[in-house]
Amino acid sequence: TRINDYEYIVLGSANLEDVSDELGLHLESDDYDTIGGYCLEKLDHLPEKNEIIITDDNILLRIEAVDKNRIEKVYIKLPRPAEEGN
């Protein structure tokens, strides 16, 4: 779900490659095919709601909903491009 040009909420079961392509990102995982799995890999534990991951590309991923051992929703905030002249 698109909130604006920089903010999205996606299902944890969403395909990682599809999310990356759709948002123009470079999220990759050797072991997982979903955005939820990607978050698990980065955190190395089952996250709680509102846990945050910052990627090397300065993309913020916040866990929006967890059900038992599954990430249900992930909030994604893309970095805004730097203003020219700053």
List each model region and its residues.
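Cytosolic regulatory modules rich in charged/polar residues
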Residues: 1-86
